[in-house]
């Protein structure tokens, strides 16, 4: 087998880095790799090592007592040192009778992998020596081998196996990549402190937003209640993910309880994604900002579609986790295709609704609300730009590396590209979004703003009873002032008599005034007239 194909095989293995401390291998899938930290780089209670446990062995010929499994443990940088290239271009990996006849190995190494002290790099054609030791042995008996591979430096280590004497023999074994800090895979080690930080950050944001909601509980919009519930949900979801990595680090990934817990987290992850899409769709439709309430039929359709998307997402994640990663099956498409269609539908509906809402606000000259939606669009574009920027930077970081160096370094930053970076971007976007729609003493005026539509066709979209009820809820918490109530009463009369007339409530008309809706302007003017 050519070394180029061997390198490509390990490159594919890197794309599916072991998701835990232990990995199963057999006669069909006989290679496995994982990053390992030295005790100096990531301190812990034990010295890191790699061990091999043979669980099953089915001999092709029961009379052949010498048959077993050949094992080699090595640093990936030294993969060229395994095997010897023959004159015909093929590579002889195992020290068998043929290799002994050619003098490629000694009798004491029979059944083991052939190791070369010096090798030629296929990319640079330069000779180089071993950077780390290569452990090779044979095993015929079931159980854990006495020989373990000690990790003295941080690197990407691999275990390759082969059944010697007969290629038709079957076996099953477990490789234990034991790091100093615990059972968690090295590529996920930093997820524990990262998710701990995110859990604390979400908890702080939830406390702050809860305090604002309690402080302005009589002026809350329905949308702000949605955001509060979502804050609590995101905090719980992040804590559960953090606890998952802590449990896996302590117990390993082989327990049934951990797999059940993984399904539970999948449900939460599906809820997080679905709730995000639903919230974005409701805002794009103008819920709570442009209109105090949406049409009941339209709102029900959004909720039903969100529930359907949630069910499809849960089915996809459960199928993904329950399916054996070694068995490539197209059955995953049964749930993957509907999920992609649902996500595309959400994406299309959100953008089209956002465009219609902004067009409507522009036609009605509702400048304040239009600016809020513009900020939201800008925030979405910036978040996408940051996501792609992180991907671009990570890509260029590996441009100057050769294939071996890239494989050696990728596992250290893989979690940043696929998990941490999107999680941090999502957190920042959500915090900024929640800040835009935070509860204030005047935030309820966004829903009952007097900067109303000027066409009679849209009158039905604004329920004056909702406006009055919102105003009545807020007034008891303020000192009773007859002139304000008189002004509010006259305002309703003006709205009922002539809907096209814009009331005298100013929506940031003064360049030096930072107040969104100055509800005291007319009252002060009226008092000035009465004094004169």
From Swiss-Prot:
It comes from the Eukaryota. The keyword Signal applies. Residues 1-20 form the signal peptide. InterPro entries: GOST_TM (IPR053937), GPR107/GPR108-like (IPR009637), PTM1-like_N (IPR053938). Glycans are attached at residues 152, 253. Belongs to the LU7TM family. The modification Phosphoserine is found at residue 497. GO terms for cellular component: clathrin-coated vesicle; cytosol; Golgi apparatus; membrane. It is a multi-pass membrane protein. Present with 14600 molecules/cell in log phase SD medium. This is Uncharacterized membrane protein YHL071W. It is found in: Golgi apparatus, trans-Golgi network membrane. Keywords: Glycoprotein, Golgi apparatus, Membrane, Phosphoprotein, Signal, Transmembrane, Transmembrane helix. Residues 215-226, 284-301, 352-375, 436-532 are cytoplasmic. PANTHER family: GH17801P, LUNG SEVEN TRANSMEMBRANE RECEPTOR. GO terms for biological process: retrograde transport, endosome to Golgi. Residues 21-193, 248-262, 323-330, 397-414 are lumenal. The keyword Transmembrane applies. The chain crosses the membrane at residues 194-214, 227-247, 263-283, 302-322, 331-351, 376-396, 415-435. Its main location: Golgi.
